[in-house]
Amino acid sequence: MSNRKQARLEAKRFIDTLSVEPYPNSQKSYLLGSRPDIRVPVREITLSDTLVGGSKDAPIFEPNEPICVYDTSGVYTDPSHDIDLYKGLPKLREEWIEERRDTHILPSMSSHFARERLADETLDELRYGHLPRIRRAMGQHRVTQLHYARQGIITPEMEFVAIRENSRRLAHQDPSLLQQHAGQNFGAHLPDLITPEFVRREIAEGRAIIPCNINHPESEPMIIGRNFLVKVNANIGNSSVSSSIEEEVEKLVWATRWGADTVMDLSTGRNIHETREWILRNSPVPIGTVPMYQALEKVNGVAENLTWEVMRDTLLEQAEQGVDYFTIHAGLLLRYVPMTAKRVTGIVSRGGSIIAKWCLSHHQENFLYTHFREICEICAQYDVALSLGDGLRPGSIADANDEAQFAELRTLGELTQIAWEYDVQVMIEGPGHVPMHLIKANMDEQLKHCHEAPFYTLGPLTTDIAPGYDHITSGIGAAMIGWFGCAMLCYVTPKEHLGLPNKEDVKTGLITYKLAAHAADLAKGHPGAQIRDNALSKARFEFRWEDQFNLALDPVTARAFHDETLPQESGKVAHFCSMCGPKFCSMKISQEVRDYANNQTLDTTVIDLVMPAESIQLAMQDKSREFLASGAELYHPLVKEPIEE
């Protein structure tokens, strides 16, 4: 059996047998809003107690507070829900959308291509079995979150994300959890409490977006903006030579489990329409696409044969399926193409290269630019956010921050203001490949020219010498630009520049980028960002191994690495690990020093460095006698348990 067929069969088995799989020692809980159907998911990590004294027979313990963390996994980790990928997810937002009474059900699909696919009986086996009804705005209504925010309306979606951003952090009582460095936020406004009104105001000003198409009611609202937690996007999608619908659905579920805040379906292979339907109906997070990829497939891959009519039909098709945001490369103008002639790597964006070829073939202006207002009209009818693509992003550090890149960026700023005229939500895409010392200039230029619309970057990669490790080279740049103010980071996997990522690559890319985003939140001084770090550090110092595993971004890998060398159960309570062993564990020695100081009723926070020499000598003699009396052994050996064969 071929590797490709084997992968598809394994993915099919995953879909057929998928069941709820909670994280270790965690439970799904929901924070309630002002109405019963605003139920915001969080993951609550239960911690073990801390030994604080007593004896072996009568130990005294102190409880540790559970830690609540942001959760993107949807009902896939909720034991109260029965998973059935063939039926899709609950329609969380359906009632909210209906209550606004500004949309109606369409009698049929608006897209000619979508109607053709529906009529094709040969696709019945591939097609998702429970196609939803299609909604569109009534008449001239605009049904975007930006429109409501500008009208002073706080929607359930806005309240949902306000609760989600706070995630119960204000409920913590342990002062050791709440300590936090001030951070440097570079002008961001980070309130101690995110309120629904704050969310509304940020959206109204264009500084944040909630991507939530009215035809994707299954999605759990989330917010992208400089003044909120840094978010992470994961890319999935098939190609002409790899992957299947089953594999892409498996990647979707896998990505949300490991923290993807949004997912982009970048499919360029067969059955793009059907693949996307399966993804949308089973996605608890917003889904983005690059409509140009599918439009190109419709003209058999010949860029110069693209037309506005084909593109418009594709936009309608995807908007009515429920795509939450479109990447549109409307800022790449004909006159910018010659600016790339002296680049080391030319135009590396797929969408950008397609547009550049079309412009040169016809010697006409980019049709996405000339028809941009029509694009905005479509988006306003379905609440599709625009992610304005950087078709001229640098593909090597040699090309970073050049004339072509920043010329396009300025045009994206002009397009942002046009989109806002139609109440369409906007974010701006950024590079790319940028060395560390040039990264901040990218953020500064974006804020200056794009009116503080959220920035969304691919990395950036900080060096070009690491094929196979580009998740690391880009994670460095992602952490930096997130600190400077980037709102969402698009992950890079180890397969970047080498091939289509598989399931494990998706996980590796996501964990790397969740780390980068969290590091950025810490550096910005985002309120509550350090709580999880403090909890894990406390568990580490107290040798609560199980808590260390469970608080980690990847509990599975943390446990596996520990158990490679200390697989016995006693290793989970030992006061050392295999790095230093029992004799050289700095934390164990530090604990012994602290315990001794406490037993001597010394103040461990204030040490008298001018203690009389006579007192020091007496104390040293006491400890010498104690050491000799105990057998003169520096460390007492632990009783080892046999390893079961």
UniProtKB/Swiss-Prot annotation:
Give me the comment on cofactor binding: Binds 1 [4Fe-4S] cluster per subunit. The cluster is coordinated with 3 cysteines and an exchangeable S-adenosyl-L-methionine.
**May I have one GO cellular component term?**
cytosol
Q: Name one GO biological process term.
A: thiamine biosynthetic process
Entry's Pfam families?
Answer: ThiC-associated, ThiC_Rad_SAM
Q: Which PANTHER family match?
A: PHOSPHOMETHYLPYRIMIDINE SYNTHASE, CHLOROPLASTIC (PTHR30557:SF1), THIAMINE BIOSYNTHESIS PROTEIN THIC (PTHR30557)
How it assembles, according to the record, is: Homodimer.
Which HAMAP family does the UniProt record give?
A: ThiC
Name it: Phosphomethylpyrimidine synthase
Tell me what organism the protein belongs to.
Vibrio cholerae serotype O1 (strain ATCC 39315 / El Tor Inaba N16961)
Which gene is transcribed and translated to give this protein? Answer: thiC
